[in-house]
Amino acid sequence: MNKTLKTFSLALALVAATCGAALATPSTQIWIPSTDVQAYKTVHLGLDNYTRTSKHNGVTTNTYDAGVTVGVLPFEKLQMEVGVDYMETGTNSATDSSPFYFNAKIGTPEDSLFPYSPALAVGGYNFGTKVGVTTQNITYALAAKTLPVIGRISAGYYHGSGRVLVDENGKSANDGVLLSWDRTMSEISDKLWAAVDYQSGNSGAGALNFGVSWAFSKNVSLIVGYDIYNNAYTGGKNTVTTQLDINFP
């Protein structure tokens, strides 16, 4: 009986991994959440895709994500955003039948609590609607500080569903660290931004990612990045990601 349950759990995890190459996106770096929060009444539209670099063996489905995030608090030192994403692989999988995911975040900017204080954020994402399949239910806490010349360093911790976030053996792999570096490359152009981020763990959520962004205008930018999954059995083949971000107004 235990072996049967373990096999069933792993099967669900692999199904969920077909959408594992994307996050129900709060304000992010390349892959992990950031401490940034959408300003009050700002509506953020994100159009992301994750395209596999190989179609041989393992998880090879591409993932497409359209999301809306809205800033909902009118305060300078305490900000909050909520969002919803429509995410699918186009394969009529179990995850595609429940494509809506929800996220929320509350945070404080740098220097808002006291001089030189870090930015802080707590939130959650990948709150799906199909229990045991899309309910990754990842919660997290992050701190970030911008250092002269170096850029912004972020660190935090996450915890999610032990039923959905599992490794290739069906064992829970539902928590770990969040790390990132990002910086506006002003030596080249104030429109150019670069980032590297990492989410630990052997579930489909674990990955090392890097990319660059170009701001075409104040409200429109495009990220191009590369995602290396910690565990090819659960995360699948590496992906190239493009992420179009548009803010209104």
Residue positions per predicted region:
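Active-site pocket-lining/capping segments in soluble small-molecule metabolic enzymes
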Residues: 156
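Low-complexity, polar/charged sequence tracts that form flexible coils or short amphipathic helices
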Residues: 134-135, 172-173, 204, 215
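Contiguous ligand/interfacial binding patches
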Residues: 201-215, 219, 224-231
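Cleavable N-terminal export/targeting peptides
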Residues: 1-29, 249
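Transmembrane beta-barrel domains of Gram-negative outer membranes and organellar outer membranes
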Residues: 23-139, 146-149, 160-163, 177, ...
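Conserved active-site beta-strand-loop modules that form the wall/rim of enzyme catalytic pockets
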Residues: 151-153, 194, 222
